[in-house]
């Protein structure tokens, strides 16, 4: 190639390939290895995922993606969603197609069609296999915006027309075809449908078009796909376990919460068992915050729109709020609060503060309201009314880093006590410079504050990812996220750096020279939303909570009804010691009562009969070790009180009962 202009392709391992002419990604993959090319799903060029058919004509970094890569697997699944849509329209020509992306655990496609039964899904799977067996190549082509609209109008696909009409004038629209079926899509996709080796359609449900209850209700089919049948089998087994742990099912079975249509979506009823758990969590969090220097506030559930106009929520978050009144007709318009911060600012402003008074740490167990779309509602994880341990720290600039780190330490302590510290990921949520109207403040302030948070996380040796566009409108934040049993990630705890709202609310302190200075603010949750935390714990422990959180901690089981009196005396002493206890005095067989207690996830059973009554003892059975032998009643009370006080998480050694 001497004397010729060459294109240099830098591969993932740092090696380089030189070409004298433009080259498709798939051809470069074959140059590397035929095995790699056969396994390839897509390419990653300078960080952007592209089709294998993409032609490269300039120097770049290239990574060949296979289904072993998360991004490569997403491409495979996206193609599987197209094959599913083709199969649906082959079998049900009247079905209109909407959207069909890949997701963390597979893929889905939305159809304007009546709900699909399990038998329908099985038939669609068979049709997909026929399509895959034919092995059609996948081709990409483009049309002008006008031609694309005309194309889908002719095919009577209104959802595709709407999507295209939302795109700018003059936009070039990309399509993908496989055989005689074509879809609107940005891609990328596999080279051929033959690349789909193992897939399964999982379920069908309802979903609003574009996630808004104002739009048409569609039918969504969920599926998943993997590179091999063994991987698919493993995933399906995990899904079965996920269904068993799903808080939406288990939480209802355990009488922790329920929902009622006439009350409304996203408005769960917390049952007595759930209230016990929430109260335990609240007492613990509030006591811990008090130890760490917080003082508590109690502020209104609503405020005039004027408050939210000062804070910026009216301009940046109004669509997520429940507004009471009409600005055009009413003298005063109110809104239920979506967060507590502006209220606590006025608690701070009620007095003048010296630099010596800071930091001031304000905590509140708040009830908040957010107008989530109906399509987003799910059990306890996404609701319209929720409870949260919220806090705002008003600090001097020189105190900001230490206090922010202390907030991270409090969050980590909470995670450790709950036994979930290994289950979370940390995210630096940043602003999006390309979407400045979403935020307040100057770019240099955002860059500086994001830099401070990045440095802190690095100093604390916390692995984290950076997420552009996920910041609050007034500042960057650390989000601590966890996945539910189905792999969907939710934010559990948030800690936000705010260098802007103190000025909005004219907050100040008096420095050592007698001058007014602006404080900084930290917005934080110590444990996050109680409802979402309950969902998380239900799924984490499959309802087998640490004893201190169990709605019922001990069940006394007399071996026959004639020992009910002694059982009730044992229960009374338990309750006197602050232990949640009941007696099963029914005339059922012992084995039945023990099994039922285990199914109801009671951690300790105390069996009492003649010997126990005579000696003032109890025979202890636990879900941890099974038979733990006979113990003095006082000894057992001391033991379980210590376990509850220390919030011990005991390892379960015995096999769980199954319903």
Enumerate the predicted regions with their spans.
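NTP/phosphate- and nucleic-acid-binding module
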Residues: 2-96, 103-659
């Amino acid at each position: 190639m001497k004397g010729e202009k060459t294109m240099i392709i830098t591969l993932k391992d740092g090696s380089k390939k030189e070409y004298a002419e433009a080259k498709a990604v798939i051809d470069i993959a074959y140059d590397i290895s035929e095995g790699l090319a056969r396994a390839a799903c897509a390419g990653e060029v300078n960080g952007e995922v592209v089709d294998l058919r993409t032609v490269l004509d300039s120097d770049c970094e290239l990574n060949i993606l296979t289904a072993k890569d998360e991004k490569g697997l997403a491409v495979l699944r996206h193609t599987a969603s197209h094959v599913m849509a083709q199969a649906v329209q082959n079998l049900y020509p009247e079905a209109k197609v909407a959207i069909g992306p890949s997701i963390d655990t597979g893929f889905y496609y939305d159809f304007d069609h009546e709900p699909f039964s399990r038998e329908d899904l099985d038939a669609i799977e068979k049709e997909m296999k026929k399509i895959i067996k034919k092995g059609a190549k996948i081709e990409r082509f483009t049309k002008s915006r006008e031609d694309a609209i005309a194309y889908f109008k002719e095919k009577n696909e209104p959802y595709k027309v709407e999507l295209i009409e939302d795109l700018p004038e003059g936009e070039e629209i990309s399509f993908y075809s496989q055989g005689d079926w074509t879809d609107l899509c940005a891609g990328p996709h596999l080279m051929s449908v033959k690349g789909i080796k193992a897939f399964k359609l999982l379920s069908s449900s309802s979903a609003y078009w574009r996630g808004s209850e104002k739009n048409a209700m569609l039918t969504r089919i969920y599926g998943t796909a993997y590179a091999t049948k063994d991987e698919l089998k493993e995933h399906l087994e995990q899904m079965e376990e996920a269904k068993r742990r799903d808080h939406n099912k288990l939480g209802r079975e355990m009488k922790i919460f329920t929902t009622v249509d006439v009350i409304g979506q996203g408005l769960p009823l917390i049952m007595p068992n759930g209230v016990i758990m929430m109260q335990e969590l609240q007492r613990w969090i509030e006591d811990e915050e008090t130890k760490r220097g917080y003082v508590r506030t109690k502020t209104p559930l609503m405020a005039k729109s004027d408050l939210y106009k000062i804070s910026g929520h009216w301009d940046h978050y109004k669509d997520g709020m429940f507004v009471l009144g009409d600005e055009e007709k009413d003298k005063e318009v109110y809104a239920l609060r979506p967060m507590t911060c502006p209220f606590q600012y006025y608690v701070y402003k009620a007095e003048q503060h010296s630099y010596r008074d800071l930091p001031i740490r304000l905590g509140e167990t708040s009830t908040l309201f957010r107008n989530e779309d109906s399509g987003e509602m799910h059990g306890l994880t996404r609701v319209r009314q929720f409870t949260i341990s919220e806090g705002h720290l008003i600090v001097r600039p020189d105190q900001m880093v230490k206090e922010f780190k202390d907030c991270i330490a409090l969050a980590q302590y909470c995670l450790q006590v709950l036994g979930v510290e290994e289950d979370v990921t940390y995210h630096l949520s940043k602003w999006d410079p390309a979407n400045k109207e979403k935020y307040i403040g100057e770019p240099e302030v955002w860059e500086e504050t994001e830099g401070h948070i990045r440095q802190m996380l690095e100093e604390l040796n916390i692995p984290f990812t950076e997420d552009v566009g996920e910041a609050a409108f007034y500042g960057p934040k650390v989000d601590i996220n966890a996945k539910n049993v189905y792999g969907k990630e939710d934010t559990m705890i948030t800690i936000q750096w705010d260098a802007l709202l103190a000025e909005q609310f004219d907050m100040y302190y008096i420095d050592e020279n007698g001058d007014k200075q602006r404080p900084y603010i930290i917005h934080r949750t110590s444990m996050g939303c109680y409802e979402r935390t309950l969902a998380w714990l239900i799924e984490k422990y499959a309802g087998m909570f640490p004893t201190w959180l169990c709605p019922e901690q001990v069940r006394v089981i007399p071996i026959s009804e004639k020992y009910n009196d002694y059982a009730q005396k044992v229960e009374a002493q338990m309750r006197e010691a602050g232990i949640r206890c009941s007696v099963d005095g029914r005339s059922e067989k012992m084995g039945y009562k023990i099994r039922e207690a285990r199914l109801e996830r009671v951690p300790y059973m105390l069996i009492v009969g003649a010997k126990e009554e005579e000696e003032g003892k109890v025979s202890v059975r636990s879900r941890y070790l099974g038979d733990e032998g006979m113990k003095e009643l006082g000894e057992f009370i001391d033991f379980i009180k210590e376990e509850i006080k220390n919030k011990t998480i005991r390892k379960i050694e015995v096999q769980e009962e199954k319903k």
